[in-house]
Amino acid sequence: MNTPIYDYLAKYSESGFLRMHMPGHKGRSSENILSKVYPLDITEITDAGNLFENDGIISESEKNASRIFGTKATFYSVGGSTLCIQTMLALMKYDHRNVIAVRNAHRSFLSACVLLDIDVSWVYPVYEDSIISGTVLLCDIEEKLKKTSNACLYITSPDYFGSMADIKSIAELCHRYNAVLVVDNAHGACLPFYKENMHPIALGADMCCDSAHKMLPALTGAAYLHIGNPVYSSKVKEVMTMFASTSPSYLIMCSLDLCNVFLEDQIKQRLKSSEKYIACLKRSDALKRFKTEIPEFYSEPLHFTINAYESGINGLKLAAMLRKRKIEYEYADNTHIIMLFSPIDDADVYNRLENVLDSIQFQPSEVSNLKINFPAPEKYMTIREAAFSEYEEIPVEKSGGRVCAAVNI
């Protein structure tokens, strides 16, 4: 497969052109860790294309990605899924859609709602032992769709824990009510490449975002915006310019270009190996003391979530034990620890983690049934009004009846 962005950068770096253009390092700098990177870092010069135009080497590379993912169109983001989410919601604003969203949305969604002055009608998941991860019921979604004309449903799947919603059934339900389904698939970039294609676009979503940098070999900030409904394709780049930097990173775009090659040539075999390694890890003696299964519709296989609470240990205490043994986790709180595998990880990674978990000794404490009751609060103001209002910081135990001014996750 061709790699138009990488090929151009490699050729230009060796061309001998005198660089009378940005960036200021001019393709060279004093000897440091980035000295081999600078020659590939350019701006929109002749023949380098433009991220926000529909021709040139970047557009050619995006077409490769679209073919690999099986979408109507795919666009690159150098601002992570955050930029994709801003763009998708702006497209819904153009379409005069009324936004319904599942409440465990990421802060990037709420920030985009602030910027676009979108008022949200919330669907609340059924939470078990964490407000980060919960099960959304089809009946609750349908109840909202019945009451909302020209609707858009926004849902996060997989969530931070790796738990996945039944996107196929949700897509069918949305389209029955002529609603648009938008999916934050930031944690699910690998989903098209398992034996069963579980990607939101394949399951009927109208658009979604994938954070390539989260689960694939791509630089931080690299993401894909996928379109399943071609009605929205023509406006994506125009809308994206409202939020994106006018100096997009060619290094990040190059990493997406090269990631496409990995996806086409290697990922399916690597994921087969990953699934085998994970299955062996979960069956190992080291995992007998830890609860790792998530009671959900499905779980993204590379998300390795330990329910510390049900394992009889405080999650932050377990996290400290891991760090002491040089394991850096993705996230930890009192009840859970999240660790992320990647298709890049080999057997040594899994063996090392298994050995560390096996070395951790603790006396499990007796746990009571941790059931979170999270009632739907009364709406007092819009998200934008709350974001720009005066606020004060108070202990969470004294926050009953108050308006939340910001989010943390």
Language-model segments: what does each one mean?
Residues 48, 75-77, 153-156, 338-340:
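Short glycine-rich or small-residue beta-strand-to-loop segments that form or flank ligand, phosphate
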Residues 1-56:
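N-terminal "arm"/small-domain region of PLP-dependent enzymes with the aminotransferase-like
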Residues 286-408:
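Conserved C-terminal alpha-helix-loop-beta "cap" of PLP-dependent enzymes
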Residues 5-10, 32, 53, 68-71, ...:
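Conserved PLP-enzyme active-site core in the AAT-like
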Residues 73-75, 210, 326-330:
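A short linear hydrophobic-aromatic micro-motif
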Residues 27, 160, 214-215, 230-232, ...:
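Short, glycine-/Ser/Thr-/acidic-enriched flexible segments
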Residues 38-80, 104:
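Conserved N-terminal alpha-helix of the aminotransferase class I/II PLP-enzyme fold
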